[in-house]
Amino acid sequence: MHMEEHALSAMDDELKLMLGRFRHEQFVEKLGWRLPIPPHQAGYEWDQYDTEHARYLLAFNEHRSIVGCARLIPTTFPNLLEGVFSHACAGAPPRHPAIWEMTRFTTREPQLAMPLFWKTLKTASLAGADAIVGIVNSTMERYYKINGVKYERLGSVIDHQNEKILAIKLSAHREHHRGARLPSGFTSEALLEETA
């Protein structure tokens, strides 16, 4: 697996199509998310938060196919937590230059998730983030716990499209998490190189 950081403006048309198609496959087709996709974007998933303020982490396999993605947005710019899920926070959604939102995080294979997660945190921290916020479902919350990710809940669990979700906040610095080392099954040299 090879990981790269991209800005929307720097992506060529082919890469944009690949990412939009991958997100649609993962979120709409696989997970069944009901998203407002315009007719001219059928088969592709984008939203109003895909702007020049977003940074994208993309994971590729040896055939240059996308197998994972994540989106980072500073909370000083429009973001999903503030614009759609503010009711998931007990108080006002975080809004600070050092707090970034991570959304549209997904991988084709489960074993790719934590390498991409750590790489996303590293990208955010190098860009000036101290903390990451986002929405997770109960499955992802359990996955974070299993993998030693320390986080705090920003509010109570709420129902959204027949799913339990909650807003969380976590450190953008890998050393603050108990699972800072990859599980032994995932410690190939290639993965360690990408996530160091």
From Swiss-Prot:
The keyword Transferase applies. This is Acyl-homoserine-lactone synthase. PANTHER family: ACYL-HOMOSERINE-LACTONE SYNTHASE, ISOVALERYL-HOMOSERINE LACTONE SYNTHASE. One of its GO terms (biological process) is antibiotic biosynthetic process. The lineage of its organism: Bacteria, Pseudomonadati, Pseudomonadota, Gammaproteobacteria, Pseudomonadales. Pfam families: Autoind_synth (PF00765). It catalyses: a fatty acyl-[ACP] + S-adenosyl-L-methionine = an N-acyl-L-homoserine lactone + S-methyl-5'-thioadenosine + holo-[ACP] + H(+). Its EC number is 2.3.1.184. Gene3D superfamilies: 3.40.630.30. SUPFAM superfamilies: Acyl-CoA N-acyltransferases (Nat). The keyword S-adenosyl-L-methionine applies. Required for the synthesis of a yet unknown N-aceyl-homoserine lactone (N-aceyl-HSL), an autoinducer molecule which binds to PhzR and thus regulates phenazine production. Keywords: Antibiotic biosynthesis, Autoinducer synthesis, Quorum sensing, S-adenosyl-L-methionine, Transferase. Belongs to the autoinducer synthase family. It comes from Pseudomonas fluorescens. GO terms for molecular function: N-acyl homoserine lactone synthase activity.
